[in-house]
Amino acid sequence: MSNQPKKYETQNIANSTEESDAFDIVTIPVPSEEPQESDQTEEHESGIEQFSESHAIHVEEQSDRSFSSLEPDSEQLMKEVISPRQVSYTPQHHEKQYAMQSPNDDSLAFLDKIKAIKESLQESMEDSLATVKVVLIPVGQEIVISFKVDTVLKYLKDYFSHLLGIPLSVLQIRYSGKILRNNETLVQHGVKPQEIIQVEIFSTNPDLYPVKRIDGLTDVSQIITVTVQTGLDRYQQVAVEIVKSDFHKPFLGGFRHKVTGVEYHHAGTQTVPKKIPERLSVFCRDTQTVFQKKNLQQTTNTTSTQMTNIGVYVSNMTDKLVTPGKYFSAAEYHAQRLKAVIVIQTYYRQWHAKIFVEDLRRQKSLRLEWETQQELRKIREKEEWVKLDYHRRHNPKTSEDFEFLYNALEFWRQEELKRINQSFTGAERKAALCELLEKETQIIASIGRHRYIAYTANQEAAIQAFLDKCSAPKIWRTPNGKTIEMDTQFTIRARELQNIYKCIMLKNISQDERLDVLLTLKHTVKEHECKLTQEILELIDREVDLMMRGVKHHNLEGLRKRIATLFFHYIKTPLFNPEVAKYLKVPQDPLKFYKKIYFCHSCQLYLPSTEFSISSTSRRIYRCRNCISLENEAQKRESFLKYRCLLQQLYFTEADYEDDSKIAFLMQLQDIQYLTENIWASQSVLSAWDDLSDLVMVRWNKSLEWSPWNCILLTKDEAAAHLNLTSIEEGYERSFIHKIKHKHILAKNYFSQIPVLASFILDDPEIDEIRWKHHSDTTPKIIESQRPPP
């Protein structure tokens, strides 16, 4: 027996139970190394001892990166050949028996038979093994084991279920992109014995049962014996340590054999890198305390001087004679420096003065240029306003334009009336007044003709806008700024009717094209039978008949206009065009319309609420917009265009502040007119400028929101200067401030009638103080009668 110690490495993978054959195969045993013996008898004794202990089974397996050995379950087969008595020999008993018996042929034959059976069992078990490289997904850890190709994969899954701590039903094995079932074997998928394959194990529920790394498999090693040929007939057994690690081998280069195709890597690729030792935590006083040490050190500087001496010649051709200069004292030195400083200061101040003057000159030129541009801008705006006024007079289109024309007519009539009253008397005056009345009548008739033309054009534009609104697709705006459009069956129907209406309204088309349009219209209208559709069909047949008889186009204008009008009524019917129901002024449900109509005492008509103009202070509804406009054209002939511009500019100014102001947007046209005329006298409070086109209404205190009691009427330039003030008390005199506050109190008294604005006024402490100061005691007095005592 050899006394050499056996080398064992710590086994990190837990062995499975001996009850299952597959688990014995998966088990990775502790490798052992057998010492070599020269004596043949001792070699057989060692074989018997190792066989009785059933620990040494050599399985040599080769892989690209790691090797593993699995212990075959040969114990049961060996028991059939050898009895328990023969297997349970101790080393001492065996030595005594060997000393008593002499070696003979029977014992040697028996040992050879045992060894042959053992080798045959090992070969039969090794032939059915395959090297399986298991990759854990998603951690990427690689584990190399040996597994029988004819064993069901349920045992492999049970093994890794025990290692990973994951239920068996959650784990899945994948090979070549296919999921392997529990009752399948590797042979069924074409895996042969002694073959190297790679499978992947992953979890079907990674959130609840994630696959993690197995830390116990990082340093598993094995020692095997390899026979190496050292000479012609010489062989030597070398112990090789195989380190199994999940370290991913990097490719650092190599070479490939052209004949055999074997790829050889460098040593750095085949060696696991050494671990960097972790730095120990140091928390002692030396690492947290700073010690300073200060030492002064003067280095030596060796110098030498060359001079003439015996045997040394130094040339003096380049030498020069230095004579001492004039000596001056410290006072003279400082006086000279002071003189130089004065010179520098003089030139610097001169340069600074030039720069300052040039800067002032440049600012002045910029200011003059800016003022010139502002004057030109004002002149340009004035000219544009005059051009717009002229265009409105000659091409009126909107109600504001006709309102402006009637205002100009009234202004002209007042001037002519004043001139006639000053120039004529008696019969001449009456004749001049009659002539003035006749001219006024002609002008009113001309304005009426322009109004009819504008009404016709506006009516066509309104119809087209109405049809565009009905046929428009549904639009949504996404958070990223893009728009989404969707067409419904109702919008598609509305678009088809709109296209037919446009074709009907086309002019200067041929007779065949007109017949095609009428035929399309006829097929569209035939879908519904009612009185309106029957009338449209009759008119279509009449036009076709007249066209076949050769009637000219200008004689068919009335008929075509009637067809277009009836077809527009067809489009406005919700039964034929469901999309139009959303845009009709008169709703289909009478109950909804009942609460929104009012009676006009002037035209005696019931109209919707949108046809009435209501001011902020009005409490009842008397006349509609048309009656008020008609009364203005007949009597006052006032123009509210400038007040509209003033109110619109106020809206824009308050919107730019972005401070959630509310009162300014509650103001109506009548309110801004009253505020301008009655409170501010239609002129600037600073310069008394009375042209409303140049006036704006801004905040008095810009830190508070605009209101009738926090505003001031100024020109545009004055408003810009007012808004630049940091303090009102510093910018204006006390008398002017008192005057403005008085106007604010007048505005509060007027607009306090509005319930919405009254809620803002009641919260003002200043108005409460004024009311308390002028409050009179109205409590009833109690007079007690005093009777004389009896």
From Swiss-Prot:
**Gene Ontology BP annotations:** cilium assembly; flagellated sperm motility; mating
Domain called IQ: residue spans: 337-366
Q: Where in the cell is it found?
A: Cytoplasm, Cytoskeleton, Flagellum axoneme; Cell projection, Cilium
CDD domains (UniProt xref)? Ubl_IQUB
Q: Which GO terms describe its cellular component?
A: 9+2 motile cilium; acrosomal vesicle; radial spoke; sperm flagellum
Q: Which UniProt keywords apply?
A: Cell projection, Cilium, Cilium biogenesis/degradation, Cytoplasm, Cytoskeleton, Flagellum
Region Disordered, as annotated, extends over: 1-49
In terms of InterPro entries, this protein maps to: IQUB, Ubiquitin-like_dom, Ubiquitin-like_domsf
- Judging by the UniProt lineage, the source's domain of life is Eukaryota
Q: Domain (Ubiquitin-like): give its ranges.
A: 130-206
Briefly, what is this protein's role? Adapter protein that anchors the radial spoke 1 (RS1) complex to the A microtubule of outer doublet microtubules in axonemes. The triple radial spokes (RS1, RS2 and RS3) are required to modulate beating of the sperm flagellum. May play a role in inhibiting signaling via MAPK1/ERK2 and MAPK3/ERK1. Additionally, may play a role in the functioning of cilia. Not required for the functioning of tracheal or ependymal cilia.
**UniProt-recorded name of the protein:** IQ motif and ubiquitin-like domain-containing protein
Q: What's the source species for this entry?
A: Macaca fascicularis
Lineage, broadest ranks: Eukaryota, Metazoa, Chordata, Craniata, Vertebrata
Gene encoding this polypeptide? IQUB
